[in-house]
Amino acid sequence: MLTLKKIIRNTARFGHERFDLAGHQVRTSSFKFGPVKKERLVRALCKTWSEKTEAGWVRSKYATSIDFIDPKSHVRVSCSCPDFCFRFEYALHQQGAANIHFSNGESPGVRNPSLIAGCCKHVIKLADLLVSQGKTDRNFNLL
């Protein structure tokens, strides 16, 4: 199990451009935050999208979520974007920080051969939104 802070730190190993992109090019809508009684966790959920990428305009919206699964701030993260699916989902699943929802469950041999448990820019944007909305502190612990 991993904390959100640890996952975001691991993401920095892929380069700082993810943090810059999350701040400037990722947009959010339909933000929801609250307990999920059947699963005994607190979930943050929103739709995210990138307004522009290197290849041009992208209009796809992605379902992005962060589940706080215990009082020690361990999380499960998820995003339906291709970067998360084919780079991070398997590695996070190996650490207990994600379920296999969107990928095929195979190891990302080319995109993430070291199996670094990081996240996409959409998850980083949702984490920033949690801090700005006062739901978590700067270390991503629930308030």
Label for each model-derived stretch:
Residues 1-143:
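Long, low-complexity, compositionally biased intrinsically disordered regions
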